[in-house]
Amino acid sequence: MVLLPSMTSLLLVFLFLYGVSPVISDGSDHRYKVGDDVPLYANKVGPFHNPSETYRYFDLPFCSSAPVKEKKEALGEVLNGDRLVSAPYKLEFLGEKNSEVACRKRLSREDVAKFRDVIAKDYYFQMYYDDLPIWGFLGKVVKEGKTDPSEYKYYLFNHLQFEIFYNKDRVIEIIVRTDQNFLVDLTEDKEVQVDFTYTVRWKETEIPFEKRMEKYSLASSMPHHLEIHWFSIINSCVTVLLLTGFLATILMRVLKNDFVKYAHDEEAVDDQEETGWKLIHGDVFRFPKHKSLLAAALGSGTQLFTLAVFIFMLALVGVFYPYNRGALFTALVVIYALTSGIAGYTAASFYCQLEGTNWVRNVILTGSLFCGPLLITFSFLNTVAIAYQATAALPFGTIVVIFLIWALVTSPLLILGGIAGKNRKSEFQAPCRTTKYPREIPPMRWYRRTLPQMAMAGFLPFSAIYIELYYIFASVWGHRIYTIYSILSIVFLILVIVTAFITVALTYFQLAAEDHEWWWRSLLCGGSTGLFIYAYCLYYYYARSDMSGFMQTSFFFGYMACICYGFFLMLGTIGFCASLLFVRHIYRSIKCE
């Protein structure tokens, strides 16, 4: 039983190392001689404003001078929607060409209509040359001041200009341009003969091979962009300082009597009448309802927090450099699988501390709490992608691989973690004895209820990260490159601190109002930032992006719902743990009968 998870874990580590560094491992061997064939791969095409809606290159009626060969791809590349095939253009090392004919094709009326439709939707293509990405638009629409789309003119770019930079025997950079002098008019519904041609120019450069990917990260590191990012951090730090001062004031108020007691040794302090949070010391550690669900949420949240920490560590050491195809998706799948034991251990140990008896059910609930909604969402969205015949639709073989990872690694580690948590012989540490009968909670003002407090708890952490959210969204759901992982790590740390502080403060106010049911409230308040992020999704979609269509809309809101749900669990766990430490601390400082 122990050997199987160990072997599968080693297999996953190998898969991870293979998946996150295909460019590094290949690039070290990419030395060419004059005339060597350097493969050019066509990846995908799609509407520029709908990044999830991409199709195979040859789904459009392009021609090819040779049989199309598919490139074998890693797991992360497939999850990223990459489908690389050999392109019709031949770019030998240091081989210059001038208006070379790649292939010829007579477009039928259906082909012309298809090209005209994609040109109207601003379709672009993406290719890779020696693992360097290049893009270009398929054509253009000439409106000439006319407002009726039936009067527009549609042109297909049939000539590409490749400008390639090299350093000794290595390819350093490639630029592709469409030539406005080579256009094919596709306005009318008639057959058209098209010659797809290209020009190749080689230029020498002093840029070393190790720095050839740096140009893709320069855009996000421009001074005016950095100023915005640093302003975001300063704004967040001010929020943290205000909250820290606010919390310090609360703690001073809470422990004021104890400071007086220890400073002046006055016995009269012990005899004063208990009020507020002291009055409910016999109920504050009464175990909550639905403790199995609470423990499962804490287990899943702990796993997701661990996953986020590892992802940031990999980002800071440079694994997720621009256009390292599929590295992030590979890392997410592998690290999530390997950290499932943390979820099982955390959930089962806490559940048993709360005197739970059905730990098997608790472990199953933990494993399905996040994966269940994710599976349902994926099944729906993958069906949509299949209906659209988009590259986002996962092949059956990839689905089998993911299922095997779940069956052979995720589930066994989850169960082993649950067994370890169950066997952890520790009782819940409660400084005060719980009374036999629960105390009645007095009526609360509207602003002390759950929903208003969730709104307050989510707004402050969200205000600390909302500036950075735009750049993240523009990178994930657009074509902007995000590489400032150090700043993102600082923002994430601030998010964690603010979430913990604001949840502790609201927990104190709840206890001061003699409301002892703080367990679920602290988790809901901590996780409410996820709801604010999802509300930002609505704003971003309608006000800051040009996304459209059923597929792109469903992918955006579907996967963002899963991401925000993950943030809810992770930040809710942080808020609960901070509140638990705070509650234990303040009740240790009083004398409990």
Curated annotation (Swiss-Prot):
It is found in: Endosome membrane; Golgi apparatus membrane. GO terms for cellular component: endosome; endosome membrane; Golgi apparatus; Golgi membrane; Golgi trans cisterna; plant-type cell wall; trans-Golgi network. SUPFAM superfamilies: MFS general substrate transporter (SSF103473). InterPro entries: EMP70, MFS_trans_sf. Residues 252-303, 348-366, 420-453, 508-522, 576-593 are cytoplasmic. A motif (Golgi retention signal) lies at residues 591-593. Disulfide bonds: none annotated. Keywords: Endosome, Golgi apparatus, Membrane, Signal, Transmembrane, Transmembrane helix. A motif (Endoplasmic reticulum export signal) lies at residues 582-587. It is a multi-pass membrane protein. Residues 26-230, 325-326, 388-398, 475-486, 544-554 are lumenal. The chain crosses the membrane at residues 231-251, 304-324, 327-347, 367-387, 399-419, 454-474, 487-507, 523-543, 555-575. Residues 1-25 form the signal peptide. Pfam families: EMP70 (PF02990). It comes from the Eukaryota. Belongs to the nonaspanin (TM9SF) (TC 9.A.2) family. The C-terminal KXD/E motif functions as a Golgi retention signal, certainly through the binding to the COP1 coatomer. This is Transmembrane 9 superfamily member 4. It comes from Arabidopsis thaliana (Mouse-ear cress). The lineage of its organism: Eukaryota, Viridiplantae, Streptophyta, Embryophyta, Tracheophyta.
